[in-house]
């Protein structure tokens, strides 16, 4: 299979679909790596992470991180087996990278601010793309943000735009792509 991109709205069932899809690809000798990109910074996010972990049970090896993937996954790469990996999710990864840029005034961001974030986000997305070939199968999950209203504030518009561009980048190189709506996956590539 190679690289598979799974997108959909919030609570659309995309993670559950991606998890089941990847488990079905395991040849019996592979590890199922779950690269969790969320940072649990409040109670709601902690509960969401706990729910995901409970659903995965012991079928997965969870690795947490949203950047510097060669370093984050170095222990996985020491194994000669071409394992499978699920990245959940690209939009969380992007938001974490954006919020590392503490010196940006998001009420009045400049073009330089956007360029700075673009460089940081693209660097990490490219690093993620570069490690894909070290796995048998990789599924990248991301939120589809471009179907709603135009955000009324600069940070919201920027996030929607950069996430959309990175979704396009992954979808373009993916071997397959799925759009999940109300728990129903539709193959779009």
Model segments located where?
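N-terminal/domain-start segments enriched in small and hydrophobic, helix-friendly residues
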Residues: 1-3, 80-82, 136
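Conserved inter-motif catalytic segment of the P-loop NTP-binding fold
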Residues: 43-127
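Residue-level signal for inorganic ion chemistry
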Residues: 18, 52, 86, 143, ...
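Structural motif
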Residues: 5, 84-86, 139-141
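Conserved P-loop
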Residues: 2-77
């Amino acid at each position: 299979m190679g690289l598979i991109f799974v997108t959909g709205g919030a609570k659309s069932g995309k993670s559950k679909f991606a998890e089941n899809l990847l488990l079905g690809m395991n040849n019996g000798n592979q590890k199922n790596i779950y690269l969790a990109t969320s940072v649990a910074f409040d109670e709601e996010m902690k509960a969401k992470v706990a729910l995901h972990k409970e659903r995965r049970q012991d079928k997965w090896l969870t690795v947490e991180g949203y950047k510097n993937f060669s370093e984050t996954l170095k222990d996985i790469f020491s194994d000669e087996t071409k394992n499978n990996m699920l990245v959940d999710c690209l939009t969380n990864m992007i938001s974490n990278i954006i919020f590392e840029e503490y010196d940006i005034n998001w009420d009045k961001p400049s073009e330089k601010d956007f360029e700075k974030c673009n460089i940081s986000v693209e660097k990490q997305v490219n690093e993620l793309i570069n490690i894909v070939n070290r796995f048998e199968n990789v599924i990248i999950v991301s939120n589809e943000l471009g179907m709603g209203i135009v955000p009324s504030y600069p940070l919201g518009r920027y996030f929607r735009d950069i996430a959309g561009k990175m979704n396009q980048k992954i979808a373009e190189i993916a071997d397959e792509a799925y759009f999940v709506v109300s728990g129903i996956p539709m193959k779009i590539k």
